[in-house]
Amino acid sequence: MPFRATVLTLYPEMFPGHLGVSLAGKALERGDWSMEAVQIRDFAGDKHRTVDDTPAGGGAGMVLKPDVLARAIDHVAADDGRPRLLMSPRGRPLTQERVRALAAGPGAVVVCGRFEGVDQRVIDTRGLEEVSIGDYILSGGEPAALVLLDAVVRILPGVMGNQLSGVHESFEGGLLEHPHYTRPQIFEGHEIPAVLTSGNHAAVAQWREATARRLTAERRPDLLERARHPKRDPPQPVKK
């Protein structure tokens, strides 16, 4: 069954956005994956279609109401087994590992936050997994949702023309990607590294590995540290 994305948002016109063009757009037209953008306001219970209210305890901004969002989630998700994701700056960082896990599943329900945030009770009762795309604040969850779905859709079977393109990329092997070069041989006095035009495939692979490790050490030493000390599952209690 194709990957199915359902996005809950106050701005459904923002979707599919850039995912409606290029390889992702062609795959969408072919039915390799599907997207539905659902207006949260449609689940408000008053004539003004109110979706937010003032924060309990005071403070600036407004909070997305739990009853409205819960009705929206229940309507689109029910018990279909798809993970329910809330785009949030306080969520766990999105990683390529999580992206691969999502791509291997049936799809996702993605909730786009707005205002000051979402009432914690709907997060708890509807099992929303908070996901962050970085340590910065956006005006809403829609751009973050597009980033997440872009990362997932591009590695779905049949989306990329060359599946190897998705294998030799940053983060796929725990390293940043090596530099790329193409013709002309000399550009403004700078030549393509000789090893890349030597025809020696083993030497090319070795050069790419070495430069990837150097770049990772310079720019993302945390990735190397993570590879040296992978997370392990906590020990399970012995059953007597």
From Swiss-Prot:
Keywords for the protein's UniProt record, in alphabetical order: Cytoplasm, Methyltransferase, S-adenosyl-L-methionine, Transferase, tRNA processing
Composition bias type Basic and acidic residues, residue spans: 215-227
Listed InterPro entries: Alpha/beta_knot_MTases, tRNA_m1G_MeTrfase_C_sf, tRNA_m1G_MeTrfase_TrmD, tRNA_m1G_MTases_N, tRNA_MeTrfase_TRMD/TRM10
GO biological process terms on file: tRNA N1-guanine methylation
Molecular function, one GO term: tRNA (guanine(37)-N1)-methyltransferase activity
Subcellular localization: Cytoplasm
Assigned GO CC terms: cytosol
UniProt EC number: 2.1.1.228
Keyword Ribosomal protein assigned: no
Enzyme class, UniProt record, top EC level: transferase
Region (Disordered) residue spans: 215-240
UniProt catalytic activity: guanosine(37) in tRNA + S-adenosyl-L-methionine = N(1)-methylguanosine(37) in tRNA + S-adenosyl-L-homocysteine + H(+)
Record: residues binding S-adenosyl-L-methionine: G113, I133, G134, D135, Y136, I137, L138
Predominant location: cytoplasm
Assembly description: Homodimer.
Family: Belongs to the RNA methyltransferase TrmD family.
Function: Specifically methylates guanosine-37 in various tRNAs.
Protein name as catalogued: tRNA (guanine-N(1)-)-methyltransferase
Organism: Rhizobium meliloti (strain 1021)
Gene (name only): trmD
